[in-house]
């Protein structure tokens, strides 16, 4: 994943460490008055990112982050999800469709059925197929746990 497109942005100093992953939630009213707003808002709202490089140790004043912000390079981070086994082929490009999951799920399985940062119809690449998950309510449905890159 080293050849992925990087984006330069600002992030709170507490998160400005290589390998840290986060979801970008968009701007706040405090951002309106900031001269660096356009750099911060270069990310896509609701998407998951990973810090791949801290550019320098220059601390920038930030109205949102109490300890300031730093310049970092980020890439979109993979998302773990459940996928119909017929679509779970490593390297394939798909349009994500959330599977029909049992109503009574444990928290981990629920998060895989309805992953944050991924919308139905969104294009993504299946990076890795990690195993089979069977739904108790309907044994005919076979799902695979996969790593997807939107």
Swiss-Prot record:
InterPro entries: UPF0179. Pfam families: UPF0179. Belongs to the UPF0179 family. This is UPF0179 protein Mbur_1033. It comes from Methanococcoides burtonii (strain DSM 6242 / NBRC 107633 / OCM 468 / ACE-M).
